[in-house]
Regions:
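Bacterial N-terminal signal peptides that target proteins for export
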Residues: 5-21
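C-terminal motif of bacterial Sec signal peptides marking the signal peptidase cleavage site
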Residues: 30-32
Length: 328
């Protein structure tokens, strides 16, 4: 009777080992065909931020404790600052003695009178907030929350408003304090013209105001290098998805120059002016222009090459760790 070799365990083992060896050899041969460019992913600025994630800095922690009070702690007299006249869409407004209905405008203050349950068409009472407006008129906001939900909520957002207590807390913490500005774009105050003055210079905080719903804090500063001149920057608070311009993105508590002792003085002056030159390192360029929107890092015959891309067609090319070419 003829024996089937495929049933021989030794034969099966030999063929398995042989196929494994062929696969490994083929994989090694194929990997040698790659130049490095084909397998190099585009790294976004978000990837860079994740790599640099660490314990919160002093700047990240400085205003982190300032948060709106939960609704259960709201008392009569609580103030909200109007940021947009579209708030009239979400408010029920009464008329004054002359029969005029006033639309709240940006900068107006609404003062809470009551937070009380009111009947609805579904017979399920909801908490309605009653405010007095800047003209003494009565304004009502329907929260859509029953009393239990109202008391259990940690926060509530009234559209087109800013919590005035939060602005007061930031003002108490910042006014009169000497800081260093790291934000590049600012505006003249109170005119509001956009400017890009020098960064990493000392400033003194002179005032704090309510801003917009997206950028709720305006910090008014007097730069050391432009005394008697007021500038302003917008700032966010908290740790939500919209907190993209918090204190640590705008200010430094200490002189940033002390963190970079190896940077030459003439290069530091370029950085403060938002300029670059050939031969600067990636860190120096990042300090001057900010983080790129994306970069590609690939090996080449000349060494490691990095390409940084910014908005408006700006790009930087680094070779072996120094700036070799750029377009601004």
């Amino acid at each position: 009777m003829m024996r089937n070799l495929s049933d021989d365990p030794n034969s099966i083992m030999r063929r398995t080992l042989s196929m494994t060896a062929v696969c490994l050899a083929l994989a090694a041969a194929l990997s040698g065909c790659f130049t490095g460019v084909e397998s190099t992913p585009i790294i976004s600025s978000k990837d860079v931020q994740r790599q640099r994630a660490s314990a919160p800095s002093a700047e990240q922690s400085y205003l982190a404790d300032i948060r709106p009070a939960p609704p259960s702690q709201w008392k009569p007299g609580k103030r909200l600052i109007v940021t947009d006249s579209r708030i009239s869409i979400v408010l029920d407004a009464s008329t004054d003695a002359q029969g005029t209905r006033h639309t709240p405008t940006p900068g107006d203050t609404l003062r809470l009178v009551t937070a009380a349950p009111t009947p609805t068409l579904t017979e399920q009472p909801e908490i309605t907030l009653t405010f007095v407006g800047a003209h003494g008129d009565s304004l009502a906001y329907h929260t859509g929350l029953d009393e239990r939900a109202w008391k259990s909520r940690q926060s509530i957002e009234i559209p087109f408003t800013i919590d005035a207590d939060v602005i007061d807390s930031v003002a108490h913490r910042l006014i009169g304090k000497h800081l260093y500005i790291i934000a590049q774009r600012r505006m003249t105050w109170p005119e509001g013209a956009v400017i890009t003055p020098r960064r990493y210079v000392g400033v003194t905080v002179r005032d704090v105001r309510g801003g917009t719903a997206e950028l709720p804090v305006i910090v008014v500063i007097e730069p050391d290098d432009a005394p008697d001149t007021l500038q302003a920057v917008y700032m966010t608070l908290g740790d939500g998805a919209t907190a993209t311009r918090n204190f640590d993105k705008v200010f430094s508590l200490i002189n940033p120059r002390s963190r970079y002792p190896r940077i030459e003085d003439d290069v530091w002056q370029l950085i403060c002016d938002g300029k670059i030159r050939l031969g600067m390192t990636p860190d120096e360029c990042r300090l001057s222009l900010g983080a790129p929107t994306e970069y590609i890092k690939v090996p080449s015959t000349a060494g490691m090459v990095e390409r940084w891309t910014y908005p408006d067609g700006i790009f930087l090319i680094f070779e072996d760790g120094v700036l070799a070419r750029y377009r601004r």
